[in-house]
Amino acid sequence: MAEQILVTTTENIPGRKYEIIGEVFGVTTQSKNAIRDFGAGLKSIVGGEIKAYTSMLTESRDQSIARLRQNASEMGANAVVMMRFDSGSIAGDMQSVVAYGTAVKFID
């Protein structure tokens, strides 16, 4: 059921009326590992994309959206509008990604 929750970055869903349930979040935090750090250190010398970190952030983003959908479903929502991401480092070796928005329920 949670995977059926519509998630959009827009404020409105054309052709749909809904009531606001409230704010909803999906959070994930991942730690870096020694292999990634070693590769990142080498890559920072020569420049270029650090694919291991890009992959970690992409995975974190996907997990945070899945958790956002699950939390919205538990609130009785059909959709999440105005979804945004925020991310940051924790203690220099962890990365946190938050997906957040407004949970809404469609009015038929």
Curated annotation (Swiss-Prot):
InterPro entries, per the entry: UPF0145_dom_sf, UPF0145_YbjQ-like
Any matching Pfam family: YbjQ_1
Gene3D superfamilies: Hypothetical protein apc22750. Chain B
Family, as annotated: Belongs to the UPF0145 family.
Protein name: UPF0145 protein LJ_1287
Organism listed in the record: Lactobacillus johnsonii (strain CNCM I-12250 / La1 / NCC 533)
